[in-house]
Regions:
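N-terminal secretory signal peptides that target proteins for export/translocation
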Residues: 1-6
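Bacterial N-terminal signal peptides
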Residues: 9-19
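Scaffold/interface architecture of coatomer-like assemblies
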Residues: 22-368
């Protein structure tokens, strides 16, 4: 996003769904109490949320209630985790720019979200900070705490959150994947929750890299999209010394999205008021498109919020949603390593039209 823009908390939250049991010659046994089936590597993880006709979340389903298809071919469900099993959450706090006045609100909202999680659920947190490199300040990604179930340690980490002078949004998402979502070696579900407007200002990475990193992990991605555009546009007009600026990378991205061929100024201060507003409008549209795309592809959701005061309700909805998410896993019957995208479809047996199913849409197969 832009330097000094009202930024928000980005919560990344993690679902651990990888199986650890070695696959021997005998098939893994099913545990009747929690309908758990556990197997091994190269498992395709599929988070699934089921709702009834009025949108209420449905609990109590079993592995035998589901069917999963890959490119139209039914697959054998090798792993099933119920909605009662714990999950891991990573919170990414975006407190760049003018959110200085909102830090207490951000901390309270995050603290309530943590308190609403169940025993056994764990949390990790990432935030932004300002580093000084070669005499110049630069926004950076900061790991506040690794995944932990210690609520006291988490609240202490929240107290240490400060502000930054930029928004390395994409870098932070990649950092969450690398430092909090990967590995662990435990049979836990994972989910990523992001609170913010989704507009990057200082990252070295791009959205495509975020997609490439997150989609293979098989986690559901949720966004609380906070509308910061009115604040930004109010500050875009007038003296450039006080106006919010986009990075050179974002300006190039803006012109590229329009297919513009003419050489344009990469200095935001040299743009006129109307072009600054056009840049703002288009970059927010791109951010909205990216959030919707990633959430839909992974089986997550986007929760709109006009400001931070609505974040608490959105957090509560997400906590309920991920607390009733099932996790299916299968080994693809297509053994080709062709690097092609494979579409996933999940259905409920004998309940067609009665319940709605939201699930991961697909994945890209490995290539030789």
């Amino acid at each position: 996003m832009h330097k000094g823009v009202c930024k928000f908390l980005v919560l990344s939250a993690v679902f651990w769904a990888a199986g650890l049991c070695l696959y021997a010659q005998d098939k893994p046994k099913t545990e009747p109490d929690d309908e758990r089936i556990v197997v091994n590597t190269d498992l395709i993880d599929v988070p699934v949320v089921v709702t009834d006709g009025v949108g209420k979340l449905v609990k109590g389903l079993k592995a035998s209630d589901f069917k999963v298809f890959e490119d139209g071919v039914e697959q054998e469900i090798a792993e099933f985790r119920t909605s009662t099993e714990p999950f891991d959450v990573a919170l990414l706090l975006d407190t760049s720019g003018s959110t200085r006045s909102e830090l207490n609100l951000i901390r309270r909202a995050a603290s309530r979200f943590i308190a609403s999680l169940r025993d056994g659920d764990r949390v990790g947190m990432i935030a932004f900070r300002t580093d000084t490199v070669a005499g110049r300040s630069k926004a950076a990604v900061d790991l506040l705490t690794a995944i932990t179930g210690d609520r006291r340690a988490l609240n202490q980490a929240l107290d240490s959150v400060a502000t930054s002078n930029g928004t390395p949004y994409y870098d932070a998402l990649l950092g969450a994947a690398e430092r909090l979502l990967k590995g662990g070696g435990e049979n836990r579900r994972r989910v990523l929750v992001v609170l913010g407007d989704g507009v990057d200002s200082t990252s070295e990475s791009v959205f495509q890299e975020v997609e490439d990193e997150l989609l293979p992990l098989g986690i559901a991605v949720y966004f609380i999209r906070v509308d910061t555009r009115p604040f930004l546009e109010e500050n875009l007009l007038g003296d450039c010394q006080f106006a919010m600026r986009f990075s050179v990378a974002q300006l190039r991205r803006y012109y590229s999205s329009l297919g513009a061929r003419a050489e344009r100024s990469m200095d935001f201060c040299k743009l006129g008021d109307f072009e600054r507003l056009a840049v703002s409008k288009r970059l927010y549209e791109l951010a909205d498109e990216e959030m919707a795309k990633l959430a839909k592809a992974t089986g997550g959701r986007v929760f709109p919020a006009s400001d931070l005061t609505e974040a608490g309700a959105a957090f509560a909805s997400i906590a309920e949603d991920i607390g009733t998410t099932y996790s299916l896993g299968y080994y693809s019957s297509n053994e080709k390593r062709d690097g092609k995208f494979r579409r996933i479809r999940v259905e409920l047996k004998d309940k067609a039209g009665k319940f709605g199913v939201r699930a991961r849409e697909g994945y890209t197969a490995p290539a030789n």
